[in-house]
């Protein structure tokens, strides 16, 4: 399982939100490229970037920062989400050297777009499913749909999606523990690899994910915990590498 540091971008800075609220953010750095360097030096093998402005605007807003990070670390897989709602945007990021694009809102509102994206950019597409009480949320978590997470995930199995990033909104940014049960259930219900996100606080939470022994859980995204020092990236990755499940 990969430990994937998150860099959330708002107005060009590296921030973290609580439960997806743009008015409840903490600025951790005004230099996201330097922050990326910090996690690379800690030994991370993938980075998770989110264009928060883009998620709310429906188009890339912090694209220059994303491109700068991708060009500085061409051998590091980077996944980017937030405002990706057209093939043109995906093409822009792929050409910039980004490894994966995360389709969120558009995957819920127009599921057939995921298939189009996978055909145009095979191996490059991740679907981001954000949920509240098992139902998918969209538009930067501002709207909660009537669509069940598991039902939507299964729909994408035939498209060739590389992974699903599953976020429990109630947990995100709160550091009260990952929703292991829901994440493991999703991994068991679909053939698509699942990346856990939201609520990870410390090594105990990483152990709980590992102890779930769900082979479909291939990664864990962490943000506030690594910025506030309750989780060490290198230590967490070493735990995952040494786990015998």
Swiss-Prot record:
Its EC number is 5.3.1.16. GO terms for molecular function: 1-(5-phosphoribosyl)-5-[(5-phosphoribosylamino)methylideneamino]imidazole-4-carboxamide isomerase activity. The keyword Isomerase applies. It is an enzyme of class 5 (isomerase). One of its GO terms (cellular component) is cytoplasm. It is found in: Cytoplasm. The keyword ATP-binding does not apply. Transmembrane segments: none annotated. It holds the Pfam family His_biosynth. This is 1-(5-phosphoribosyl)-5-[(5-phosphoribosylamino)methylideneamino] imidazole-4-carboxamide isomerase.
């Amino acid at each position: 399982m990969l430990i994937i540091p998150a860099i959330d971008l708002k107005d060009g800075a590296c921030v973290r939100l609580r439960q997806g609220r743009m008015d409840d953010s903490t600025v951790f750095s005004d230099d996201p490229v330097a922050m990326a360097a910090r996690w690379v030096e800690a030994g991370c093998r993938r980075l998770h970037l989110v264009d928060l402005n883009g998620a709310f605007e429906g188009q890339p807003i912090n694209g220059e920062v994303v491109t700068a990070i991708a060009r500085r670390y061409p051998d590091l897989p980077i996944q980017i989400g937030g405002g990706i709602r057209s093939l043109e945007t995906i093409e822009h990021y792929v050409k910039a050297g980004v490894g994966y694009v995360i389709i969120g809102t558009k995957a819920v509102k127009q599921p057939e777009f995921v298939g189009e994206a996978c055909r145009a950019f095979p191996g490059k597409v991740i679907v981001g499913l954000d949920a509240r009480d098992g139902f998918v949320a969209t538009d930067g978590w501002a709207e909660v749909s009537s669509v069940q997470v598991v039902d939507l995930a299964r729909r994408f199995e035939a498209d060739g999606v590389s992974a699903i990033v599953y976020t429990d909104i109630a947990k995100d940014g709160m550091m009260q523990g990952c929703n292991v049960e829901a994440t493991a259930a999703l991994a068991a219900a679909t053939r698509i690899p699942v990346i856990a996100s939201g609520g990870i606080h410390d090594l105990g939470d990483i152990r709980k994910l590992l102890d779930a022994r769900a082979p479909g859980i291939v990664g864990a995204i962490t943000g506030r915990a690594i910025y506030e020092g309750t989780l060490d990236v290198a230590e967490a990755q070493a735990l995952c590498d040494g786990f015998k499940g």
